[in-house]
């Protein structure tokens, strides 16, 4: 089955008519249950490991069973941010959704950081765990996500690339200081090559790297004292000063 997301008319299921013609099934015909009144701006469609399709929209996420017989019978579940409910989505603008090798589902939001699906109840209520700059993200504006062969997630953000290690819930950030130049990543523009390289779209071409070659620096810079001030005034070395010789040559005060 082929699905298409539109930024004005929700989603479309592309099928064939009785005479082989292409037919677009949407909220105007047989896709009656889709919440078009609130989720008409769809950004992204993907499947998870439990037979569900997920739609990222500007007003939350929509999920439904992909094993349906007739489009009109699909039951859609809409998940959105609920004020004061920390187990709901942290932000409604969902840019990207990824199902991982560990059968987990993560959602990248524009302003609410990263969300992980914890569970969906029988009545369709979703529980999520969110990660933000308070947890180590470099930015809460996330644009896309890719998973490497070690099951780490690489996230393009407004402030560079972020590596998320799900097993330890740990973030490693790589900004322009790490990359040596400023990169402005594009929305929902990334892929993983057959060789394991990551490619992310930017405002100035493609940004490509091999995940295994990206490591945090272990260099610990030395502590160097260059100036001594007392009461907001510089201390000059001298016989009547508490600093007898230059600060570089002073062992203790």
Predicted regions span which residues?
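Conserved beta-propeller blade signature
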Residues: 1-4, 52-55, 104-107, 152-155, ...
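Residue-level "micro-hotspots" composed of small/polar
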Residues: 19-23, 28-42, 59, 68-98, ...
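Beta-propeller-forming repeat regions
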Residues: 9-11, 206
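Solenoidal tandem-repeat scaffolds enriched in leucines and small polar residues
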Residues: 5-9, 40-44, 49
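A structural signal for beta-strand register positions
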Residues: 49, 146-149
């Amino acid at each position: 089955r082929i699905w298409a997301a539109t930024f004005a008319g929700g989603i479309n299921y592309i099928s064939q008519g009785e005479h082989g013609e292409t037919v677009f099934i949407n909220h105007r015909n047989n896709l009656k249950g889709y919440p078009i009144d609130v989720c008409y701006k769809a950004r992204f469609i993907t499947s998870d490991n439990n037979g569900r399709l997920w739609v990222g929209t500007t007003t939350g996420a929509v999920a439904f069973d992909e094993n349906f017989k007739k489009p009109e019978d699909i039951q859609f579940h809409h998940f959105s941010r609920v004020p004061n409910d920390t187990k709901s989505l942290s932000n409604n603008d969902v840019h990207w959704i990824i199902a991982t090798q560990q059968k987990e589902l993560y959602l990248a939001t524009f302003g609410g950081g990263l969300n992980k699906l914890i569970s969906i109840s029988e009545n369709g209520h979703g529980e999520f765990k969110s990660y933000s700059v308070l947890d180590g993200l470099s930015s809460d504006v996330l644009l896309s996500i890719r998973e490497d062969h070690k099951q780490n997630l690489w996230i393009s953000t407004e402030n560079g690339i972020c590596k998320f290690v799900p097993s330890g819930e740990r973030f490693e950030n790589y900004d322009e200081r790490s990359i040596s130049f400023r990169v402005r990543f594009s929305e929902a523009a990334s892929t993983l090559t057959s060789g394991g390289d990551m490619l992310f779209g930017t405002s100035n071409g493609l940004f490509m790297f091999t995940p295994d070659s990206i490591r945090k620096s272990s260099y610990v810079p030395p502590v160097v004292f260059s100036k001594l001030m007392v009461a907001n005034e510089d201390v000059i070395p001298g016989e009547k000063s508490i600093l007898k010789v230059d600060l570089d040559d002073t062992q203790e005060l």
